[in-house]
Amino acid sequence: MADILKIGKYEFTSRLIVGSGKYPDFKTTYDATIASGAQMITVAVRRVNITDPNKENLMDYFKDSDVQLLPNSAGCTTAEEAITLFRMVREATGIDIIKLEIIGDTEKTLYPDVIETIKACEVLANDGFTVMAYTNDDPITAKKLENAGAAAVMPLAAPIGSGLGIQNRYNVVFVKEAVNVPVIVDAGVGCASDAAIAMELGADGVLTNTAIAQAKNPIQMAEAMKYAVIAGRMSYLAGRIPKKPYATASSPSEGMIQF
């Protein structure tokens, strides 16, 4: 039976989401996305063209694929800005699944402004959007976002683009326990093992951009991320053994040859 990721009315068989930033061109973005097997790609609509048909348009590369464009509000610092932006995007493209991202610290950490995020989430969800909300790794905030109508919560693993990996593994577990919507670990993934760990902790998916786009070989890293997410998910579903302080022999003691 297929292991489906369901976000609102949308369903996906891949649990990896990729970003579109920091690539040299749209062609490389497309090639890496296809290699990753991802079925969603985030697009910062204030920076990447998806609405003007008279300019090079990222949508042209994906129009014949099954990859869903996921507009995000990167660059927005208030709920009002994000709400206005997404309404314009839906009017221009018809896309209603979005990544809500409202930054509180634009200089150093790029941490989210969770108060503005919750405000925007409630308005956008009531307006018919399927909202995937970028947030900190706090289970209380995650629950508030779910109550505000978020179809998925996206706690950061570490600061955006840092490549530090998951800095607080317990919080990923706490967020997962706190909500009944998918949890997508977002930001800070640096390599394939980070993605696998996120999935083994119980995350429903992983979003990564910089780790692929700025790798020495983006296509190869995209493929590595694909298999890391699959392996991590399978490991989580299989169930890990408990940790013990002492050794346990793997071979039975019965029937041993006596000397």
From Swiss-Prot:
One of its GO terms (cellular component) is cytoplasm. It catalyses: [ThiS sulfur-carrier protein]-C-terminal-Gly-aminoethanethioate + 2-iminoacetate + 1-deoxy-D-xylulose 5-phosphate = [ThiS sulfur-carrier protein]-C-terminal Gly-Gly + 2-[(2R,5Z)-2-carboxy-4-methylthiazol-5(2H)-ylidene]ethyl phosphate + 2 H2O + H(+). Its main location: cytoplasm. One of its GO terms (biological process) is thiamine diphosphate biosynthetic process. The keyword Thylakoid does not apply. GO terms for molecular function: thiazole synthase activity. Signal peptide: none annotated. Keywords: Cytoplasm, Schiff base, Thiamine biosynthesis, Transferase. 1-deoxy-D-xylulose 5-phosphate binds at residues 161, 187-188, 209-210. The active site is at 99 (schiff-base intermediate with dxp). Coiled coil: none annotated. Gene3D superfamilies: Aldolase class I. It is found in: Cytoplasm. PANTHER family: THIAZOLE SYNTHASE. Homotetramer. Forms heterodimers with either ThiH or ThiS. Catalyzes the rearrangement of 1-deoxy-D-xylulose 5-phosphate (DXP) to produce the thiazole phosphate moiety of thiamine. Sulfur is provided by the thiocarboxylate moiety of the carrier protein ThiS. In vitro, sulfur can be provided by H(2)S. Belongs to the ThiG family. This is Thiazole synthase. It comes from Nitratiruptor sp. (strain SB155-2).
